[in-house]
């Protein structure tokens, strides 16, 4: 063999050997290496994933392929920390998410040769395997078979190998410099989209409507692109600020029946300016799964039913209004009233049993995050047997910016029991009530409430005269 050729081959082998030593085959880590995993799930399409894996590392520079991560991972949020062991230095991080699909596989083979399995030309013949060159994938596949160009060739495609730059699942790839040989634990955390949680509550009202059983279910939805087996789960209730918001996801709502919740499975605590709920056991949350877990259960909480009218006429607007009276249920979230747990925002469905013992749906409302010792008011619907009418009976222009007017309301109660109706009236500008037929309470700077008793099968009129000044 020519001496120059020998020298060239020897040099090439040396280069290849050095490259293989400098960049050995990547170490692959999968969910099998996982020693623990935890999730902190937020209300706004977000979760923090925290996991620990155990690997065997070597001294020197090499790559780690960290597989089985969420498809909706925020790669810029990844944190890697060695726990004990020989340790390593993180030199570079990449996130590979060019996932294998039939279309991407074909795109990678443009300009390359492959095999086509074509159907038989006639019945009784065998399938034909031919070599072809893929010329284009634009709006369909174009092949060169021999000296001919074939469009939309029917049949199966056989590829000789999988392209190196396609991955079957999202993968973090780290270039690290190991400080020694040995077993190494990695503490890895990252943020991911595709997670959400909410609360669905059930209030079962007693026959006398003075108390009720209140239960809550946590509904967790996982569309992150990964499964989390035997995970420790925590929930954050509160409005965290984010620079970029993920789109709202549709949720699975709780079962539409007043099912009794099991024993509370979450421990609640204040955390920073939020509230943290920690599941007392581990659970598996599969990809594309909705899971419900009991949050709380309280029996016999005191309830107060309220009838409320919100009057919208006054100095401006129509002269008359007529409508139904809103029905509300109210309770206090306190230990003295058999609750006393910070309630995450969610939907409350209200039920009551009829005289035959059959559960009936009364209505539903949403609540915001509710601290301990705050009141919860739920609008259930509108009263069938209570009618409200309001009209403006007088209107006077005193000066350019001063007006006086008189309002009259009539409440007609067709029920077999006496009730109290609250009429909420709003004012604008500087106002004063000059005269009124009933006592009233100033609730806010611009809102007063008349609490009007109405007897069974009776009616009651309420009137007031007001003066308003605006600038």
Labelled PLM ranges:
Residues 3-8, 21-471:
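Long, intrinsically disordered, low-complexity accessory segments associated with secretion
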Residues 7-15:
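Sec-dependent N-terminal signal peptides
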């Amino acid at each position: 063999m020519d001496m120059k050729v020998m020298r060239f081959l020897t040099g090439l082998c040396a280069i290849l050997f050095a490259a293989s030593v400098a960049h050995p085959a990547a170490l692959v880590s999968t969910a099998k290496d996982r020693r623990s995993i935890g999730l902190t799930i937020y209300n706004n399409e977000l979760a923090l994933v925290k996991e620990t894996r155990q690997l065997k590392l070597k001294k020197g520079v090499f790559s780690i392929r960290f597989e089985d991560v969420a498809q909706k991972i925020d790669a810029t949020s990844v944190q890697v920390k060695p726990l004990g062991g020989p340790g390593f230095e993180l030199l570079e991080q990449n996130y590979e998410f060019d996932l294998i699909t039939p279309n991407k596989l074909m795109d990678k083979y443009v300009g390359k040769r492959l095999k086509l399995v074509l159907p038989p030309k006639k019945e009784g013949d065998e399938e034909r395997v031919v070599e072809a060159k893929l010329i284009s994938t634009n709006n369909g596949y174009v092949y060169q078979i021999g000296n001919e160009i074939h469009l939309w060739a029917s049949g199966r495609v056989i590829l000789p190998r999988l392209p190196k730059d396609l991955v079957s699942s999202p993968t973090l790839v780290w270039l690290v410099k190991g400080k020694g040989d040995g077993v190494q634990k990695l503490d890895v955390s990252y943020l991911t989209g595709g997670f959400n949680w909410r609360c669905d509550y059930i209030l079962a009202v007693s026959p006398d409507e003075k108390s009720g059983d209140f239960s809550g279910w946590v509904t967790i939805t996982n569309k992150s692109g990964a499964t989390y087996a035997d995970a420790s789960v925590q929930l954050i209730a509160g409005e965290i600020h984010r620079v970029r918001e993920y789109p709202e996801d549709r949720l699975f709502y709780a079962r539409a029946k007043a099912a009794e919740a099991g024993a509370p499975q979450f421990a609640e605590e204040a955390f920073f300016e939020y509230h943290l709920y920690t599941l007392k056991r581990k659970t598996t949350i599969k990809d594309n799964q909705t899971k419900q877990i009991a949050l709380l259960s309280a029996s016999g909480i005191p309830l107060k039913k309220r009838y409320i009218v919100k009057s919208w006429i006054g100095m401006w607007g129509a002269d008359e209004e007529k409508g139904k009276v809103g029905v509300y249920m109210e309770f206090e979230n306190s230990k003295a009233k058999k609750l006393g747990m910070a309630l995450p925002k969610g939907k409350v469905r209200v039920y009551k049993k009829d005289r035959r013992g059959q559960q009936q749906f009364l209505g539903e409302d949403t609540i915001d995050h509710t601290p301990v010792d705050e009141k919860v008011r739920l609008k259930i619907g509108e009263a069938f047997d209570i009618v409200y009418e309001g009209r403006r009976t007088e209107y006077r222009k005193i000066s350019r910016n001063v007006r006086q007017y008189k309002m009259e309301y009539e409440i007609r109660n067709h029920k077999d029991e006496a009730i109290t109706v609250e009429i909420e009236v709003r004012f604008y500008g500087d106002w004063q009530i000059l005269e009124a037929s009933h006592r009233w309470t100033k609730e806010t700077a611009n809102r007063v409430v008349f609490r009007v008793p109405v007897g069974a099968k009776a009616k009651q009129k309420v009137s007031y005269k007001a003066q308003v000044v605006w600038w």
